[in-house]
C-alpha cells in the first residue's frame, strides 16, 4: 500500500539531491586581486595628468598656517577643574544679565498694561 512518494526506496529523490546547486553559485575559489606596486600606481597617476600634483601642493600649504600666539593661554590659566559660580551678582552683571530681583520687578511693571478679558 505504499506509493512512490512515501516509499524510501524511490530512486527519484536520490537523483534530485545530487545536483541541488549549480556550479555557477559561488562554489569555486574567488579570483585573486593582485595589488599594484607603488611604481605602477605612480605611472598611472602620471598618465592621467600632472595637474593633480599642483593641487596637492596648495592643500598642504593651507594646512600649515601659523598659530597666533595671543590665543595660547599662559601656564597657570587653565580652566579645567575650576568651579565657576554663574549665579553670583557679579557674574550676572558681567554677562549683562539681570538678577532675580530685577526680573521680578520687570514682571510686575508689565502687569498693569495687560487687560484681562472675561
UniProtKB/Swiss-Prot annotation:
Disordered as annotated region, ranges: 1-118
Keywords from the named record: Chaperone, Nucleus
Chain intervals with Acidic residues compositional bias: 36-68, 102-112
Subcellular location: Nucleus
Biased composition (Polar residues): 1-17
Source species, domain of life: Eukaryota
Keyword Lyase: no
SMART domains, sorted: CHZ
Record's GO cellular component terms: nucleus
Claim: Chaperone is one of the keywords in the record: yes
Pfam families (alphabetical): CHZ (PF09649)
Subunit organization: Forms a heterotrimer with H2A.Z-H2B, stabilizing the association of the histone dimer. Also, with a lower affinity, forms a heterotrimer with H2A-H2B.
Family recorded in the similarity comment: Belongs to the CHZ1 family.
Biological function: Forms a chaperone-bound H2A.Z-H2B complex that acts as a source for SWR1 complex-dependent H2A to H2A.Z histone replacement in chromatin.
Name the record gives this protein: Histone H2A.Z-specific chaperone CHZ1
Lineage per the UniProt record: Eukaryota, Fungi, Dikarya, Basidiomycota, Agaricomycotina
Gene (UniProt): CHZ1
